Amino acid sequence: MLPKIALVGRPNVGKSTLFNRLIRKNRAITHDRPGVTRDRMEGLVQSIGHPSFILIDTGGVILDSHYSTINIIDELHGFEKDIFQQVQLAIEESQAICLIVNARDGLLPFDEHLALFLRKTGKPILLAVNKVDGIEKEDQIVAEFHILGLPMIAVSAEHGHNIRQLENELSLLLPNNENIKDQSTAQAALKLAIIGRPNAGKSSIINAIIGKNKLIVSNIAGTTRDSIDIPFIFNKTQYLFVDTAGIRRRTKITDPVERFSVNASIKSATKANITLYVIDATEGITAQDKRLLDLLDTRKIPFILLINKTDLIAKKQKTLLSKSFKEELQFCPHIPILMVSAVTSSGLDQIIAMAEQVYLECSTRINTGVLNRAMEEIITRHQPPVVRRIRPKFFYLTQAETSPPTFVFFVNDAEKISETYVRYLERSLRKIFNLHHAPIRIRLRSSHKKRNQ
């Protein structure tokens, strides 16, 4: 595993902007308002000539100087306590720490308080004085931070000032025995996006599977705002969870930060190998859920439906509930539906296994000769309907793509093939080649010649 460095600081010092700058992606949500980052987010930092490492962006902790450095966690409440626990976990996992302060604000009591707290960890610390852009007498402004007694660098996350030097300084904090390791394994990890309406239990499911409280869990809708990548190992295999913000109806989103989160959620689903769509069993499938599930199905995005919080449903009702979900989702009958509970861990062991199965189906490549023998069998069993006294002719079948499997039928006149018959072709291919849950595309192409075998 690659070494980790945690970005730590009070709210609105520019941690997320610096995180985005270092990983060279617009992953963390940034906004000129304290407290936008709530969960910790991880990203890969790679630069020529320097060891690669994982950077952790953490939420800002709002503390006053009267808090003790020993019993901070006991003196906090609500979100402040949850966020600080995430910061502590990030620090524990990291080999080094980057403390971020705001040059525009100057040295504040909490900066000193936090520096003292971080020193007690015994881990290497680099002080990054951010937002130095446009400040006259930069050296004089930065000088006051020397009192913290930490190695320091002045940067501007927004304008990229001294970012390369920062990368170099951060890499020097890492132990030599944990330096560069091939990242191909991580890149090849199966990526699972997890989306759904707010408070459906997405973060709870992730926490239950990986066995760590990586994400803040709350009964307040909208707790998770960023799309967060979480690498983990399950049965000696590496995976990557992408936990995204809950999706609400766009007309109800007035907060610009939350609107950004919705866009990020949909984007994450298109980039992942498999998407997990979480629904609260006590609320059922809403009209918004149906629209989004239909969108995933239309775009041929492989997904699994997770019905969470089944521990709140009576045993006799679970069978009826599963049946009702299947009836409501007749427009995508191939989608697997798993009844799970993050609280009791019921059904969670099925999620990874099903994701692997769907991914394997999506990667299926079938020989052209095998496909054409299957096509002959399919058409012999049920020929296409006659249109204007002429029965459409099928010449041959080929597979154009994988992920999702895309099959192209060459026929004499594609316009004469009905949608009903296309659905028959899809059902038949699924049955013959065991493509039970993967989305597949069926394309018809007009041709006047039968390909030479």
From Swiss-Prot:
Positions contributing to GTP 2 binding: 196-203, 243-247, 308-311
Gene Ontology MF term list: GTP binding; ribosome binding
UniProt-listed SUPFAM superfamilies: P-loop containing nucleoside triphosphate hydrolases
Residue ranges of every copy of the KH-like domain listed in the record: 364-448
Sorted UniProt keywords: GTP-binding, Nucleotide-binding, Repeat, Ribosome biogenesis
Gene Ontology biological process terms from the UniProt entry: ribosome biogenesis
Binding positions (GTP 1): 9-16, 57-61, 130-133
Coiled-coil segments: none
Subunit (UniProt): Associates with the 50S ribosomal subunit.
Known role: GTPase that plays an essential role in the late steps of ribosome biogenesis.
HAMAP family found in the cross-reference section: GTPase_Der
Entry-linked PANTHER family: GTPASE DER (PTHR43834:SF6)
Protein name: GTPase Der
Organism ancestry: Bacteria, Pseudomonadati, Thermodesulfobacteriota, Desulfovibrionia, Desulfovibrionales
